[in-house]
Curated annotation (Swiss-Prot):
Gene from which the chain derives: hsc71
Biased composition annotated in UniProt, kind: Gly residues: 623-643
Pfam families: HSP70
Keywords recorded for this protein, A-Z: ATP-binding, Nucleotide-binding, Stress response
Gene Ontology terms: biological process: response to arsenite ion; response to cadmium ion; response to copper ion; response to heat
Example of a GO MF term: ATP-dependent protein folding chaperone
Keyword match Manganese: no
Chain positions covered by the region annotation Disordered: 623-651
One Gene Ontology term, aspect cellular component: cytoplasm
Disulfide bonds: none
Family: Belongs to the heat shock protein 70 family.
InterPro entries: ATPase_NBD, Heat_shock_70_CS, HSP70_C_sf, HSP70_peptide-bd_sf, Hsp_70_fam
Protein name: Heat shock cognate 70 kDa protein
Length: 651
């Protein structure tokens, strides 16, 4: 395939989305199911690996081996409080592999474990394939988005996931920044405008304030809650119905994973309905111990169940305004991003907070981030169209960065919300006489003392010549690149001796070797998936050949044209093959092909005789014959129907 354009990928906690900028506009690409967003789910079964819709659709049957929310684990340590509290809610197993979380599943009868980066990379592979199928070209370059909140290690890990998936990640950009780009293109603003981006997705909530002037974006502040989103609203509804079930039937379904999962799916559907109707009904057959659960919920009740969560979305709005030193009257535009912003109550709360100001919903909230990422991808890969030429992107650091100085004080070198890329240098000195070295400890956070902030990494600068305290001059430099990845160096001015560290947040960055290995494994899994696909295709081919052959010889139009003996011969062989198929759903491709050859050996001579008996003239053929006849003339194995699109019903 020829090389395709760069794409923009919104790698979401619950759903992902991919877009491409071509012919002067952005196109959001639908997947093979026709959906413009794809669940960030990966499932492992005893025969195959599923990604996206296919994975989410079978989650009720296979909850322990269906992995989602990898974004909540990526770039974090196992003992991180977030990881520990999230684990309680997941049906799948998370294990501790030398301080790093891994997801453990049963795959093809073996226990396998994967890093969050690997799971995210599988979702990225899926998004890459969706784009390739649409463009008919290979896609190598992508811009991938992350929450504004992500720290360095999470950004780095997301980049690694891209590498494992075979993508060259042109840049990691903040989701709100991407939404702002989408918005900036839509609106072409001249004078300076302050824009508030309210992004409430399936799993995270981010509020950001940006200024846009002459096509230049600057992020003024970011706030939010990494743990609020559509799923939380679903959970409230699920708990409400579990309680209702208990009241009605005196039975507790909460320990039955499958029942809860089916209830959750119904609740998610009901929630979506409630954005456009005031009431939604829920009907689940045989939910628990044979009891059918038929009930309904009103929009008012749904709002009441989530009242505190909905109201709470305004706190980060106030915080981001404070950080940006802005009054709410100064906000020109409010942009809604994320599927949960379709909830009428949330729109109303936000609109009331801004004294009745109109909200911008012109961009589909699920797609705005991928839209902006696609534009950014076009810019970075040198798209010459005037729509994108005059757009410049400035991103910011979400937290202040600094080092520890005497007494455990946090000395900030780069203030939070500083536009990146950026570089800051400050001179420090020794604390005691003849001190031979200094320990440079790098922190991120807003507190005055380092013990309350987050340690990113540390290194020593040794070999300082003996001197009284306060004499040596040690120059510390913080340098952050456009991807938000930071280098910290310290140099002794007298000797020129230098040491540095790239902050990769020792939260368990993957080593080069790890990434290499994972890239190879990803290839291996892809090959296994392909083998599985071929296998299914041979099986379907054999099955359709046998059934078609059977219906062909049973067709009454052939009465008298085929001897009973031949007919019996074909039917017996077809039934034998169909019987074998029923017992061997997971045989090898070669076995299916072998059986097809055997079947063709019996059928072809008889069918050929039929043709000749019809005077060799197509006109003499019984109607319907050709249609019901798979791969005439001993079609090569696999030719019996696998050449066209093979559709199998999902049971």
């Amino acid at each position: 395939m020829s090389k395709g354009p760069a794409v923009g990928i919104d790698l979401g906690t619950t759903y992902s989305c991919v877009g491409v900028f071509q012919h002067g506009k952005v196109e959001i690409i639908a997947n093979d199911q026709g959906n413009r967003t794809t669940p960030s789910y990966v499932a492992f079964t005893d025969s195959e690996r599923l990604i996206g819709d296919a994975a989410k659709n079978q989650v009720a049957m296979n909850p322990c081996n269906t992995v989602f929310d990898a974004k909540r684990l990526i770039g974090r340590r196992f003992d991180d409080g977030v990881v520990q509290s999230d684990m309680k809610h997941w049906p799948f197993e998370v294990i501790n592999d030398s301080t790093r979380p891994k997801l453990q599943v049963e795959y093809k009868g073996e226990t396998k474990s994967f890093y969050p980066e690997e799971i995210s990379s599988m979702v990225l592979v899926k998004m890459k394939e969706i784009a390739e199928a649409y463009l008919g070209k290979t896609v190598n370059n992508a811009v991938v988005t992350v929450p504004a909140y992500f720290n360095d290690s999470q950004r780095q890990a997301t980049k690694d996931a891209g590498t494992i998936s075979g993508l060259n990640v042109l840049r990691i950009i903040n989701e709100p920044t991407a939404a702002a780009i989408a918005y900036g293109l839509d609106k072409k603003v001249g004078a300076e405008r302050n824009v508030l981006i309210f992004d409430l997705g399936g799993g995270t909530f981010d509020v950001s304030i940006l200024t846009i002037e002459d096509g230049i974006f600057e992020v003024k502040s970011t706030a939010g809650d990494t743990h609020l989103g559509g799923e939380d609203f679903d959970n409230r509804m699920v708990n409400h119905f579990i309680a209702e079930f208990k009241r009605k039937y005196k039975k507790d379904i909460s320990d039955n994973k499958r029942a809860v999962r089916r209830l959750r799916t119904a609740c998610e559907r009901a929630k979506r309905t409630l954005s456009s109707s005031t009431q939604a009904s829920i009907e689940i057959d045989s939910l628990y111990e044979g009891i059918d659960f038929y009930t309904s919920i009103t929009r008012a009740r749904f709002e009441e169940l989530n009242a505190d969560l909905f109201r709470g979305t305004l706190d980060p709005v106030e915080k981001s305004l404070r950080d940006a030193k802005m009054d709410k009257a100064q906000v020109h535009d409010i942009v809604l991003v994320g599927g949960s912003t379709r909830i009428p109550k949330i729109q109303k709360l936000l609109q009331d907070f801004f004294n009745g100001k109109e909200l911008n919903k012109s961009i589909n909230p699920d797609e705005a981030v991928a839209y902006g990422a696609a534009v950014q991808a076009a810019i970075l890969s040198g798209d010459k169209s005037e729509n994108v030429q005059d757009l410049l992107l400035l991103d910011v650091t979400p937290l202040s960065l600094g080092i520890e100085t005497a007494g455990g004080v946090m000395t900030v070198l780069i203030k939070r919300n500083t536009t990146i890329p950026t570089k800051q240098t400050q001179t420090f000195t020794t604390y005691s006489d003849n001190q031979p070295g200094v320990l440079i400890q790098v922190y991120e956070g807003e507190r005055a003392m380092t013990k309350d902030n987050n340690l990113l990494g540390k290194f020593e600068l040794t070999g300082i010549p003996p001197a009284p305290r306060g004499v040596p001059q040690i120059e510390v430099t913080f340098d952050i690149d456009a991807n938000g990845i930071m280098n910290v160096s310290a140099a002794d001015k007298s000797t020129g001796k230098e040491n540095k560290i790239t902050i990769t947040n020792d939260k368990g960055r993957l080593s080069k070797e790890d990434i290499e290995r994972m890239v190879q494994e990803a290839e291996k899994y892809k090959c296994e998936d392909d083998v599985q696909r071929d296998k299914v295709s041979s099986k379907n081919s054999l099955e359709s050949y046998a059934f078609n052959m059977k219906s062909t010889v049973e067709d009454e139009k052939l009465q008298g044209k085929i001897s009973d003996e031949d007919k019996t011969k074909i039917l017996e062989k077809c039934n034998e093959v169909i019987g074998w198929l029923d017992k061997n759903q997971t045989a090898e491709k070669e076995e299916y092909e072998h059986h097809q050859k055997e079947l063709e050996k019996v059928c072809n001579p008889i069918i050929t005789k039929l043709y000749q008996g019809a005077g060799g003239m197509p006109g003499g053929m019984p109607e319907g014959m050709a249609g019901g006849f798979p791969g005439a003339g001993g079609a090569a194995p696999g030719g019996g129907g696998s050449s066209g699109p093979t559709i199998e019903e999902v049971d």
